[in-house]
Amino acid sequence: MNYAKLLAAGALSVLAAACSQPDTTAGAGSEQAGAPRVVNVYSARHYRSDAAIYAAFTEQTGIEINLIEASGDQLIERVRADGPRSPADVIITVDAARLHRAEEAGLFAQSDFSEFTPEIADNLIDPDGYWIAIAKRARVLAYSNQRVQPDEVTTYEDLADPRWEGRICVRESGNAYNQSLLASMVARLGEEEAEAWAAGIVANMARPPQGGDITQIIGVAAGDCDIAITNHYYYLLMQNSGEAANRAAAEAVTLFFPNQETSGAHVNISGAGIAVNAPHPEEARELIAFFLSDEAQRMFAEMTNEIPVVEGVEWENERLDAVMPFVADTRNVSELGDHNATA
């Protein structure tokens, strides 16, 4: 997707109500002649790809980035507390449920994302136009090459089967990625069946939940468990890790994308939206358009092993190539937020 064409098409034009916000920030906005152009970014992402994207954006547009980084929940609370005086222009967070939470709090302005389809699938765009995905990640399985046969692994639902008793590693249930996976099960199976599935997972745990996704993969490699739930890119990062122990752990397991013959693998996102009180809405629009350019999408794929949201983007990453393509769940990711409270 060409960045210049995105801007020319007005693909991310903010609705008039958002654009008419009074500019109360000194030197803010592109309308003040001679003032430096800036965009204030509140981001829950902490990846090196983003630093490279910001640098490329500034080089091409002259717009300087003022970056605030914190957890998604902290950013939401900060913007909410600041109210109409918030300096945030763009809010970026990981996990569709957090985007939903920010939307429910009234932190996003509505935007017209229609020009991005069909290059970006409808299920990756908020139906009400408050946010759009900028990168994808799949929540998948990593199983032992020695203790699990490939035909043993099929679906998420199968993990609740008693034959997996004492064999599963997973991080704690309050983790956003696990909550969204369970929310997807609620959306697909209904609350009662999803609750039974979650109880089955707990019954089959090899150990109490601990650590992050990399810890789960290491647990499989060490023999603490036979199969783990993880985001796909952690495994790919371990393959190229500077630590020999992480590389060895990755070699001892196989990454598996479940539900390939049914609903498709569960996909979550990083997403961005323009803040409702953005003092620089046009600069915010340009930054989000740049995130969706081929250049930025390629950086996500090559630097953090994330999956581009724009169809047809080419990248050079053999590790990501090895797990692509796969069948993904096509349910709108906004439903992960809709069912998060139940999960």
Q: What is each PLM-predicted segment?
A:
Residues S20-D23, G27-R101:
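Early extracytoplasmic/lumenal segment of secretory-pathway proteins
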Residues L15-A18:
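C-terminal motif of bacterial Sec signal peptides marking the signal peptidase cleavage site
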Residues S86-I91, A109-L141, E157, R167-V170:
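A structural signal for short loop-to-beta-strand junctions that line the ligand-binding cleft
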Residues S270-R331:
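Mature extracytoplasmic/periplasmic domains
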Residues A96-L107, D126-T154, L182-A183, V267-G273:
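Periplasmic solute-binding protein
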Residues S173, Y177, S184, R188-P258:
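Ligand-binding pocket segment of bilobal, Venus flytrap-like solute-binding proteins
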Residues Y42-R45, F108-T117, P127-D128, W131-I132, Y143-N145, D151, E157, A244-H266, ...:
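Short beta-strand->loop
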